[in-house]
Amino acid sequence: MIQQESFLTVADNSGAKRIQCIRVLGSNRRYAHVGDVIVAAVKDAMPNMSVKKSEVVKAVVVRTKATLRRDTGNSIRFDDNAAVLINEDKNPRGTRVFGPVARELRERNFTKIVSLAPEVI
């Protein structure tokens, strides 16, 4: 579960390395899970890239350490909390996605992120 002040790694090549959650978007929501959109501040970024440190960005959560229960009864858990930066049209800002992503992103209409990911679990 991601909440305010949580740190996430960035799973794309937009230029940001780590982000910190400022707000979970939605009607007064406290926690974010896989597929939820958050507002975050860039805490660590690569030089000479489009995303700069201390920039406020939107991101979609693609992996969480918290166990994700599926309707089939399966549960899945990742090794890290990760997000992909998105623009206003909900398209990824980077051109590559690193690491596996959860299948729930396809149900939330983030098909571009799913198609860029090397593995969908």
From Swiss-Prot:
InterPro entries for this protein: Ribosomal_uL14, Ribosomal_uL14_bac-type, Ribosomal_uL14_sf
UniProt KW keywords: Ribonucleoprotein, Ribosomal protein, RNA-binding, rRNA-binding
Domain of life: Bacteria
UniProt keyword Ribonucleoprotein present: yes
Gene3D superfamilies, per database record: Ribosomal protein L14
Pfam families: Ribosomal_L14 (PF00238)
GO cellular component: cytosolic large ribosomal subunit
GO biological process, one term: translation
GO MF assignments: large ribosomal subunit rRNA binding; structural constituent of ribosome
UniProt similarity note: Belongs to the universal ribosomal protein uL14 family.
Function recorded in the entry: Binds to 23S rRNA. Forms part of two intersubunit bridges in the 70S ribosome.
Record's subunit section: Part of the 50S ribosomal subunit. Forms a cluster with proteins L3 and L19. In the 70S ribosome, L14 and L19 interact and together make contacts with the 16S rRNA in bridges B5 and B8.
Protein name: Large ribosomal subunit protein uL14
Source species of the chain: Prochlorococcus marinus (strain MIT 9313)
